[in-house]
Amino acid sequence: MSGAITCSAADLSALLGPNATAAADYICGQLGSVNNKFTDAAYAIDNTYLLFSAYLVFAMQLGFAMLCAGSVRAKNTMNIMLTNVLDAAAGGLFYYLFGYAFAFGESSDGFIGRHNFGLQNFPTLTSDYSFFLYQWAFAIAAAGITSGSIAERTKFVAYLIYSSFLTGFVYPVVSHWFWSPDGWASPFRSEDRLFGTGAIDFAGSGVVHMVGGIAGLWGALIEGPRIGRFPDGGHAIALRGHSASLVVLGTFLLWFGWYGFNPGSFTKILIPYNSGSNYGQWSGIGRTAVTTTLSGCTAALTTLFGKRLLSGHWNVTDVCNGLLGGFAAITAGCSVVDPWAAIVCGFVASLVLIGCNKLAELLKYDDPLEAAQLHGGCGAWGLIFVGLFAKEKYINEVYGASPGRHYGLFMGGGGKLLGAQLVQIIVIVGWVSATMGTLFFILKKLNLLRISEQHEMRGMDLAGHGGFAYIYHDNDDDSIGVPGSPVPRAPNPPAV
């Protein structure tokens, strides 16, 4: 702990006079005991802070569940809710058995961790159980992103397989590259950093959001669009989610959890900086919460007015997605940029999301939650944003002062950090495409990926989960007249 009390008998003997050695030893011993108690208290506070942050990030699973449920049609609600529970449960076991070791196992090489499988020889000198729990919450967030892209048409066994593979292997390898002190592109390396700086992805615009988004992109591409989304290869038909209320609820829960996702990624709070006695990591944590807030708010408002110009109406679900896109983008640089730069981040993130959605329609790509566009597209912009706007002072505070460490291009730091960020984008796209793309392709060839046309028309709840989620639910247009749909049609809800 910094600021520790130092004491020696030799220092006190001259002041206490003859026969003072024993007294000096006693006094120094007492001061040492007090110093140890302060150190223990600091560890306890840091671990409590990290545990609280882990609880917030885990609460995001409820946000994902509500967002997904509201974004699909009523006949598929039970299925999508079950997949969110599955992400957490299967992810917990596979991250415990393999994922944490691949990501942070000590010691390791630059590509993958090789120790601490099943948390053997744990805790270590640098990591406690609170750190494992926090990282598990991140891993299942990536899997939750993917489930939204392939909603309403995917076999349950495919969810089991992809979720376990993603949280147990694909995601941990990426997190090792950029977050482990041994990772080949990590800014935490003591030497031989990528382009002299390492790729800065503080809380996971690339590691979490791009990984989940690119995995979902391949799943949705290989499966193909839902029945009725692009009838006869023509214009897109909106297959609206059944509950804007659940979408808004999920969005606010995710917003709340993001205050553990981004500020919590400091992992410690009681670290003073050298800039002043009242300025330390606690200040950086507060600034990170502010930049997170401003980026999301700016993206929400930009989406509100941008979609109003394009569609002619105010759409709450579009605004919610814009808000989340702003959060996904700022996640990489939230700790190393000024608040004004976060506004720029959110503004551009909204435009990226709108543009990606337009491109998806042109390419006949169907993603019920816009997960690939939101998390993949906005996550990639977030990495580029760091290479442009990262501030030298904040980088040295967060990642440790290092002579010649590079910072944002627009802040006068040259282009090497931007180069490292572009490398991160390329390798994440390549790695996830090679692993998850191959997995989804194999599942399709084995007829384990997509449900039958009849089950898709009737709804996955009735076909595979014992019945509908609601006693009174809206029969979707494409289920009318299909045998086995016994629930009478209810009035359609008002347009959002």
UniProtKB/Swiss-Prot annotation:
**Presence of the UniProt keyword DNA damage in the record:** no
Question: Which Gene3D superfamilies does the entry mention?
Answer: Ammonium transporter AmtB like domains (1.10.3430.10)
Q: Name one Pfam family in it.
A: Ammonium_transp
Q: Which GO terms describe its cellular component?
A: membrane
Question: Know the name of this protein?
Answer: Putative ammonium transporter 1 member 5
Q: Give the species.
A: Arabidopsis thaliana
User: Main localization of the protein?
Assistant: membrane
Query: What are the TM regions of this chain, as residue ranges?
Result: 50-70, 85-105, 131-151, 156-176, 202-222, 246-266, 284-306, 314-334, 336-356, 369-389, 422-442
Q: Name one GO molecular function term.
A: ammonium channel activity
Purpose? Involved in ammonium transport.
Cellular compartment(s): Membrane
InterPro entries per the record?
Ammonium/urea_transptr (IPR029020), Ammonium_transpt (IPR001905), Ammonium_transpt_CS (IPR018047), NH4_transpt_AmtB-like_dom (IPR024041)
Gene this chain is encoded by = AMT1-5
**Bilayer topology annotation:** Multi-pass membrane protein
Give the sites modified to Phosphoserine: S485
Which SUPFAM superfamilies does this chain map to?
Answer: Ammonium transporter
